[in-house]
């Protein structure tokens, strides 16, 4: 099952956000959250909120534990 979360109107440069997003691509949710909590970049808090939203969407829809989730695809586009 795939969960999707989108955030719009964020005032941060895509180049800076891509540095953070590249750190968590392909990781499990638990590991990605730990990485984002200890990454000293301004985009890490934004990506963490987005990750929590995607996890909540998926957990609510199919009632699975968060240990089963991983990040298959994440990207940053320019506005």
UniProtKB/Swiss-Prot annotation:
Q: Relate the protein's function as given in its record.
A: This protein binds specifically to 23S rRNA; its binding is stimulated by other ribosomal proteins, e.g. L4, L17, and L20. It is important during the early stages of 50S assembly. It makes multiple contacts with different domains of the 23S rRNA in the assembled 50S subunit and ribosome. The globular domain of the protein is located near the polypeptide exit tunnel on the outside of the subunit, while an extended beta-hairpin is found that lines the wall of the exit tunnel in the center of the 70S ribosome.
Q: Which GO terms describe its cellular component?
A: cytosolic large ribosomal subunit
* Official protein name in the record: Large ribosomal subunit protein uL22
Statement: the UniProt record of this protein carries the keyword Metal-binding? no
Would you say which domain of life the source belongs to? Bacteria
Annotated GO biological process: translation
Q: Does the keyword rRNA-binding apply?
A: yes
SUPFAM superfamilies recorded: Ribosomal protein L22 (SSF54843)
Q: Which gene encodes it?
A: rplV
Q: How does it assemble?
A: Part of the 50S ribosomal subunit.
């Amino acid at each position: 099952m795939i969960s999707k979360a989108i955030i719009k109107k964020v005032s941060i440069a895509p180049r800076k956000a891509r540095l953070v997003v590249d750190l968590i691509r392909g990781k499990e949710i638990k590991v990605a959250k730990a990485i984002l909590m200890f990454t000293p970049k301004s985009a890490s808090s934004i990506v963490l909120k987005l990750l929590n939203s995607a996890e909540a969407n998926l957990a609510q829809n199919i009632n699975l534990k968060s240990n089963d989730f991983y990040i298959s695809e994440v990207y940053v586009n320019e506005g």
